[in-house]
């Protein structure tokens, strides 16, 4: 399928559909008109005006007072891209690079950046041909936009930088020869338009949002299985309890837990224990808070991915070219830090439920194995979950609380939003692993409640899970089962 790039509202769900469905991109007629109109306006203003225009007829950052002659305007832009490609460390995953390309095209298509049409179309060529520019995780301070990663993202269109194509790493020049493309010749302002923007931060945020929404759904299902295995009570999910403290996420989670447990034989059994530990009893309050955080962060990211984040902003209809600060990552850096905390909390409470399941209480055998002693059973998966949860806690220090001046103090306050995005994605991956370990334990523990059955919904999940992860009778290497559990969460359909 082909997705038309237009002014129509782009949602996170639509991005997921485009990426997962391997859709191609095409500019709408209206987008072509906006891009062309803005470029024509910019060229006209450069020709007519003797006033300096930041980044167009001047240097960059603290070099903004240096005027550039007309015969050097194109070289200025290519020099900018080359000099700003300073990324280090691990590569940004290809899935996120693909989202970066989509968001860069979307932002440029609004017609506020002054790029040429062929420049945008070459970015689309990269996307449509599954060409992944080699972009590095470290280097962006999140203002002036994502300069370093976007330099790496866009260098290949001018025949520089590096890409991965069909599993092979090659230079941008080699790619152009292989594809039969002429390297794009940048006009005035184009390098700045390509490098200024929040698409690296935003792409990490979008990826994390897609992952977080899925994990939030899984967390409820896995918690319900753990509750059944732990012989927990359903009363804490009663609607009347939550109606007197009606946070939206809390209400939704309690309702979801009631749905998941509906029809269970286990939940209807007389309970010896008057109440459950917090990690079970407070599922609506904790999981619900995560849902509310995801909802809030999603609303902010939704605005960001439908915005022009260039500088200067070119407004042809208002006859304005204004140097301002739409590149600053603070609006999304803070929410990404918030979501990082929420996802870490989801893993914290999950690990606590795992701990309870292996603790040898409520008629469950120690470490969920029939013959503990000679067998260590599920002792150590909880250690792994604890180690991962602990790492996530250390990653919750907000990146947006930090700033370091750059460019001789001209860019004296930055967002560090790129760091926020990178660690958010890491915490999401960590949370997925912790939840997978809880499922591994919960499914094992549930077998000690047989022949009683859980609800039809949960029994269906367990049946599918047992196709890839067996019941463990005796000690064996556990890491393959944990890996299969992670894959199950990634691949199994979840509503």
Where are the regions that the model predicts?
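C-terminal auxiliary extensions adjacent to catalytic cores
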Residues: 2-23, 27-34, 38-41, 46, ...
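Polyanion/phosphate-binding surface patch
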Residues: 49-51, 66, 253-254
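Glycine-rich, flexible loop motifs
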Residues: 2-13, 19-50, 77-135, 227, ...
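Conserved, non-catalytic sequence blocks in retroelement Pol enzymes and Pol-derived host proteins
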Residues: 112, 141-143, 373
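Membrane-embedded alpha-helical core segments of multi-pass
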Residues: 127-131, 149, 158, 220
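Cysteine-centered functional microenvironments
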Residues: 135-140, 317-321
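FAD-binding core of FAD-dependent oxidoreductases
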Residues: 54-68, 72-76, 83-108, 136-158, ...
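Catalytic or ion-translocation cores adjacent to nucleophile or general acid/base/metal-coordination motifs
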Residues: 72-85, 356-366
